[in-house]
Amino acid sequence: MKRIATTLTALLLMAGTATAQDYGQTRTLKIWDNKTAPHGNGIATPEREPEKNRLTDVSEAVLYIFPAAPEKATGQAVVICPGGGYVKLCIDYEGYEMAQWFAEHGITAAVLKYRMPNGHPEVPLEDVEQA
C-alpha cells in the first residue's frame, strides 16, 4: 500500500510540473499575497476559466518568467500584461505566446497575471508596479 501511495504521489508531482511548463515558463512568482497588497479587489470567488485560456475573477497576482534563449540573450526584459478589458485575461495569445516569441528572440519575458479591478482601478496598476 505504501508503494502505491508513493507512486501516485510521484505521478501527481510530475503532472503538476508538466502543467506548469506547458508554455515554457521556468519560474513562477507570486507578486504578493492579499495581506501585503496595498488594496484588495473584493473578489471572494475562486478564479475561473469560462473559456479556454480566458481567466476571470483573478484575485492573486502571479508573474510567469520566460527566460531568453541563452545563445540569443540580449540582456533585455519585458513585462507583458495580457488584455481582456479588465473583465478577463486572454492569458495565452496575449501573454504566453508573446512571451515565447520574445524569449526566442533573446528577450526575457514575464507574463503578469494581474488581479481584476472589480471596481478598484488601482489594483491592477499596483500589480504591474510591483512586478
Cite the ranges covered by each PLM segment.
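Hydrophobic h-region of N-terminal signal peptides that target proteins for export
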Residues: 11-18
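Catalytic nucleophile-loop/oxyanion-hole region of alpha/beta-hydrolase
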Residues: 89-92, 97, 112-131
